[in-house]
Amino acid sequence: MRCSLTSMRTIERTTAFKRDFKREAKGPHRAVLDTDLRQIITALANDQPLEPRHRDHALSSNWKGYRDCHVRPDLVLIYRIDEDRLMLARLGSHSELDL
């Protein structure tokens, strides 16, 4: 019997995302970061739609090909989805990410 998780995308994190995560884990979002971000990443990796409150949308200009969604109202995740991969690119506020 096959597990339904076999269709889950591989999750990759850029060096910038890892640095951003460490910074945010020490900041005001530390209490909810793990659970809120985990829910979003799980949904994206399994091709499930995000709740409207996350305001998921495509980016343009320097970030063409990427999307962003709000983990919290002032915390944004920038990511890219390929056929078999979810690339977590950046995590931070709009001002930190120059959005």
Segments the model singles out, each with a brief description of its role:
Residues 1-73, 81-87, 95-99:
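Basic, Lys/Arg-enriched alpha-helical interface segments
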